[in-house]
Protein backbone atom coordinates (compact mmCIF):
# COMPACT_ATOMS: atom_id res chain seq x y z
CA UNK A 1 0.00 0.00 0.00
CA UNK A 2 1.62 3.21 -1.20
CA UNK A 3 0.78 6.35 0.76
CA UNK A 4 2.05 9.88 1.13
CA UNK A 5 1.60 11.89 4.31
CA UNK A 6 2.76 15.11 5.88
CA UNK A 7 2.04 16.74 9.22
CA UNK A 8 2.04 20.37 10.35
CA UNK A 9 0.78 21.69 7.02
CA UNK A 10 -1.75 24.24 8.36
CA UNK A 11 -1.31 27.41 10.41
CA UNK A 12 -3.65 28.64 13.17
CA UNK A 13 -4.52 25.12 14.35
CA UNK A 14 -2.85 22.97 16.98
CA UNK A 15 -2.26 20.01 14.68
CA UNK A 16 -2.76 19.14 11.03
CA UNK A 17 -1.94 16.52 8.44
CA UNK A 18 -2.39 15.55 4.82
CA UNK A 19 -2.86 11.90 3.84
CA UNK A 20 -2.86 10.65 0.25
CA UNK A 21 -3.54 7.10 -0.94
CA UNK A 22 -3.81 6.64 -4.71
CA UNK A 23 -6.56 9.06 -5.84
CA UNK A 24 -7.91 9.76 -2.35
CA UNK A 25 -6.65 12.85 -0.55
CA UNK A 26 -7.65 14.15 2.89
CA UNK A 27 -6.54 17.09 5.02
CA UNK A 28 -7.22 16.98 8.76
CA UNK A 29 -6.95 19.70 11.41
CA UNK A 30 -7.06 19.38 15.20
CA UNK A 31 -7.83 22.24 17.56
CA UNK A 32 -7.59 21.65 21.26
CA UNK A 33 -7.78 21.12 24.06
CA UNK A 34 -10.03 24.20 24.21
CA UNK A 35 -12.92 25.40 26.35
CA UNK A 36 -16.15 23.70 25.22
CA UNK A 37 -19.68 25.01 25.14
CA UNK A 38 -21.70 24.05 28.19
CA UNK A 39 -23.65 21.37 26.33
CA UNK A 40 -20.42 19.74 25.08
CA UNK A 41 -18.58 19.66 28.40
CA UNK A 42 -17.82 16.31 30.04
CA UNK A 43 -16.87 16.57 33.75
CA UNK A 44 -14.15 13.92 33.81
CA UNK A 45 -12.80 13.63 30.27
CA UNK A 46 -12.12 15.24 26.92
CA UNK A 47 -15.09 15.80 24.62
CA UNK A 48 -14.66 15.23 20.88
CA UNK A 49 -16.23 17.23 18.08
CA UNK A 50 -15.66 15.51 14.74
CA UNK A 51 -16.53 17.06 11.38
CA UNK A 52 -16.18 15.47 7.94
CA UNK A 53 -16.54 17.73 4.91
CA UNK A 54 -17.09 16.16 1.47
CA UNK A 55 -15.04 16.82 -1.63
CA UNK A 56 -18.11 18.22 -3.40
CA UNK A 57 -21.22 19.93 -2.09
CA UNK A 58 -22.35 20.14 1.52
CA UNK A 59 -22.32 17.50 4.23
CA UNK A 60 -25.22 15.03 4.21
CA UNK A 61 -26.20 11.95 6.19
CA UNK A 62 -23.32 10.13 4.49
CA UNK A 63 -20.77 12.40 6.16
CA UNK A 64 -22.57 12.11 9.52
CA UNK A 65 -22.16 8.33 9.33
CA UNK A 66 -18.45 8.80 8.57
CA UNK A 67 -18.17 11.09 11.60
CA UNK A 68 -19.73 8.45 13.87
CA UNK A 69 -17.35 5.76 12.60
CA UNK A 70 -14.37 8.09 12.97
CA UNK A 71 -15.41 8.89 16.54
CA UNK A 72 -15.66 5.17 17.36
CA UNK A 73 -12.09 4.63 16.15
CA UNK A 74 -10.45 7.68 17.73
CA UNK A 75 -12.12 7.62 21.16
CA UNK A 76 -10.18 4.57 22.50
CA UNK A 77 -6.88 6.02 21.25
CA UNK A 78 -7.02 9.30 23.17
CA UNK A 79 -6.12 9.54 26.86
CA UNK A 80 -9.27 11.51 27.52
CA UNK A 81 -9.03 11.65 31.32
CA UNK A 82 -6.01 13.93 30.96
CA UNK A 83 -8.26 16.73 29.70
CA UNK A 84 -11.40 17.02 31.89
CA UNK A 85 -13.92 19.69 30.86
CA UNK A 86 -12.01 20.31 27.61
CA UNK A 87 -12.90 19.93 23.93
CA UNK A 88 -10.94 18.68 20.92
CA UNK A 89 -12.19 19.60 17.45
CA UNK A 90 -11.18 17.25 14.62
CA UNK A 91 -12.06 18.33 11.08
CA UNK A 92 -11.43 16.18 8.01
CA UNK A 93 -11.70 17.86 4.61
CA UNK A 94 -11.85 15.37 1.76
CA UNK A 95 -10.11 16.93 -1.25
CA UNK A 96 -10.38 13.95 -3.61
CA UNK A 97 -12.62 10.97 -2.91
CA UNK A 98 -10.99 8.46 -5.28
CA UNK A 99 -14.22 6.44 -5.47
CA UNK A 100 -17.85 6.67 -6.55
CA UNK A 101 -19.29 8.66 -3.64
CA UNK A 102 -22.83 7.49 -4.38
CA UNK A 103 -21.85 3.85 -3.74
CA UNK A 104 -18.70 3.77 -1.62
CA UNK A 105 -17.04 5.56 1.28
CA UNK A 106 -14.37 3.08 2.43
CA UNK A 107 -11.40 4.87 0.84
CA UNK A 108 -12.43 8.21 2.34
CA UNK A 109 -13.06 6.70 5.78
CA UNK A 110 -9.70 4.93 5.82
CA UNK A 111 -7.81 8.07 4.83
CA UNK A 112 -9.75 10.16 7.38
CA UNK A 113 -8.75 7.75 10.16
CA UNK A 114 -5.07 7.86 9.22
CA UNK A 115 -5.07 11.63 8.70
CA UNK A 116 -6.82 12.23 12.04
CA UNK A 117 -4.30 10.09 13.92
CA UNK A 118 -1.38 12.00 12.40
CA UNK A 119 -3.03 15.35 13.19
CA UNK A 120 -3.58 14.29 16.82
CA UNK A 121 0.11 13.42 17.08
CA UNK A 122 1.02 16.79 15.58
CA UNK A 123 -1.26 18.55 18.09
CA UNK A 124 0.46 16.83 21.01
CA UNK A 125 -2.71 15.19 22.29
CA UNK A 126 -1.95 12.36 24.73
CA UNK A 127 -2.59 8.98 23.08
CA UNK A 128 -2.83 5.46 24.48
CA UNK A 129 -1.77 3.71 21.30
CA UNK A 130 -1.36 3.95 17.53
CA UNK A 131 -3.74 3.01 14.75
CA UNK A 132 -3.70 2.28 11.03
CA UNK A 133 -6.58 1.78 8.62
CA UNK A 134 -6.83 0.22 5.15
CA UNK A 135 -9.63 -0.33 2.61
CA UNK A 136 -10.16 -3.86 1.27
CA UNK A 137 -12.29 -5.29 -1.54
CA UNK A 138 -13.18 -8.83 -2.61
CA UNK A 139 -13.43 -9.00 -6.41
CA UNK A 140 -16.61 -10.55 -7.80
CA UNK A 141 -15.42 -13.06 -10.41
CA UNK A 142 -12.09 -14.18 -8.93
CA UNK A 143 -12.75 -13.71 -5.18
CA UNK A 144 -9.33 -12.07 -4.96
CA UNK A 145 -8.77 -9.95 -1.84
CA UNK A 146 -7.44 -6.54 -2.87
CA UNK A 147 -5.94 -4.10 -0.37
CA UNK A 148 -6.29 -0.41 -1.24
CA UNK A 149 -8.55 -1.07 -4.27
CA UNK A 150 -8.92 1.47 -7.06
CA UNK A 151 -12.24 3.02 -8.08
CA UNK A 152 -12.44 0.58 -11.00
CA UNK A 153 -11.84 -2.42 -8.73
CA UNK A 154 -14.54 -1.23 -6.35
CA UNK A 155 -17.08 -1.25 -9.16
CA UNK A 156 -16.49 -4.97 -9.79
CA UNK A 157 -16.27 -5.95 -6.12
CA UNK A 158 -18.42 -8.48 -4.32
CA UNK A 159 -17.86 -6.83 -0.94
CA UNK A 160 -15.92 -3.89 0.48
CA UNK A 161 -14.39 -3.47 3.93
CA UNK A 162 -12.67 -0.81 6.03
CA UNK A 163 -10.31 -2.21 8.67
CA UNK A 164 -8.73 -0.19 11.48
CA UNK A 165 -6.38 -1.81 14.01
CA UNK A 166 -4.95 -0.53 17.29
CA UNK A 167 -1.21 -1.06 17.85
CA UNK A 168 0.91 -0.96 21.02
CA UNK A 169 4.57 -1.62 21.89
CA UNK A 170 5.90 0.74 19.27
CA UNK A 171 3.49 -0.45 16.61
CA UNK A 172 4.63 -4.07 16.88
CA UNK A 173 1.61 -5.66 18.58
CA UNK A 174 -2.05 -5.55 17.54
CA UNK A 175 -4.12 -4.77 20.63
CA UNK A 176 -7.61 -4.46 19.21
CA UNK A 177 -9.79 -4.26 16.11
CA UNK A 178 -11.08 -0.69 16.26
CA UNK A 179 -13.29 -0.98 13.19
CA UNK A 180 -14.35 -3.57 10.65
CA UNK A 181 -16.96 -1.94 8.46
CA UNK A 182 -18.21 -4.32 5.76
CA UNK A 183 -20.73 -4.06 2.96
CA UNK A 184 -21.63 -6.77 0.44
CA UNK A 185 -21.56 -10.57 0.26
CA UNK A 186 -18.76 -12.63 1.80
CA UNK A 187 -18.35 -15.84 3.79
CA UNK A 188 -16.52 -16.69 7.01
CA UNK A 189 -13.40 -18.00 5.27
CA UNK A 190 -13.10 -14.81 3.21
CA UNK A 191 -13.54 -12.72 6.36
CA UNK A 192 -10.72 -14.53 8.18
CA UNK A 193 -8.50 -14.29 5.09
CA UNK A 194 -9.01 -10.56 4.71
CA UNK A 195 -8.38 -10.05 8.44
CA UNK A 196 -5.10 -11.95 8.17
CA UNK A 197 -4.01 -9.99 5.11
CA UNK A 198 -5.33 -6.76 6.60
CA UNK A 199 -3.28 -7.23 9.77
CA UNK A 200 -0.13 -7.66 7.71
CA UNK A 201 -0.83 -4.56 5.60
CA UNK A 202 -1.81 -2.47 8.63
CA UNK A 203 1.46 -3.50 10.28
CA UNK A 204 3.35 -2.24 7.23
CA UNK A 205 1.31 0.97 7.22
CA UNK A 206 1.85 1.69 10.92
CA UNK A 207 5.61 1.25 10.39
CA UNK A 208 5.38 3.77 7.56
CA UNK A 209 3.35 6.14 9.76
CA UNK A 210 5.98 5.93 12.52
CA UNK A 211 8.66 6.85 9.99
CA UNK A 212 6.58 9.80 8.75
CA UNK A 213 6.10 11.03 12.31
CA UNK A 214 9.80 10.66 13.06
CA UNK A 215 10.85 12.49 9.89
CA UNK A 216 8.49 15.39 10.61
CA UNK A 217 8.95 15.75 14.36
CA UNK A 218 12.69 15.04 14.78
CA UNK A 219 13.76 18.41 13.27
CA UNK A 220 11.65 20.22 15.90
CA UNK A 221 13.34 18.53 18.86
CA UNK A 222 15.95 20.48 20.78
CA UNK A 223 18.92 18.24 21.56
From Swiss-Prot:
Gene3D superfamilies: GHMP Kinase, N-terminal domain. One of its GO terms (molecular function) is RNA binding. Non-catalytic component of the RNA exosome complex which has 3'->5' exoribonuclease activity and participates in a multitude of cellular RNA processing and degradation events. In the nucleus, the RNA exosome complex is involved in proper maturation of stable RNA species such as rRNA, snRNA and snoRNA, in the elimination of RNA processing by-products and non-coding 'pervasive' transcripts, such as antisense RNA species and cryptic unstable transcripts (CUTs), and of mRNAs with processing defects, thereby limiting or excluding their export to the cytoplasm. The gene is RRP46. Present with 10800 molecules/cell in log phase SD medium. GO terms for biological process: exonucleolytic trimming to generate mature 3'-end of 5.8S rRNA from tricistronic rRNA transcript (SSU-rRNA, 5.8S rRNA, LSU-rRNA); nuclear mRNA surveillance; nuclear polyadenylation-dependent mRNA catabolic process; nuclear polyadenylation-dependent rRNA catabolic process; poly(A)-dependent snoRNA 3'-end processing; RNA catabolic process; RNA processing; rRNA catabolic process. It is found in: Cytoplasm; Nucleus, Nucleolus. Belongs to the RNase PH family. This is Exosome complex component RRP46. It comes from Saccharomyces cerevisiae (strain ATCC 204508 / S288c). CDD domains: RNase_PH_RRP46.
Amino acid sequence: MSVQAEIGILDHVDGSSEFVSQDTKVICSVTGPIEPKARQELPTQLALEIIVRPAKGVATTREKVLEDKLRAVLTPLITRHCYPRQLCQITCQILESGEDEAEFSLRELSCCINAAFLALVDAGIALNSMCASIPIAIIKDTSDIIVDPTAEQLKISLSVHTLALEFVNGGKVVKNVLLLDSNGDFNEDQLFSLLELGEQKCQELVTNIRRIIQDNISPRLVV
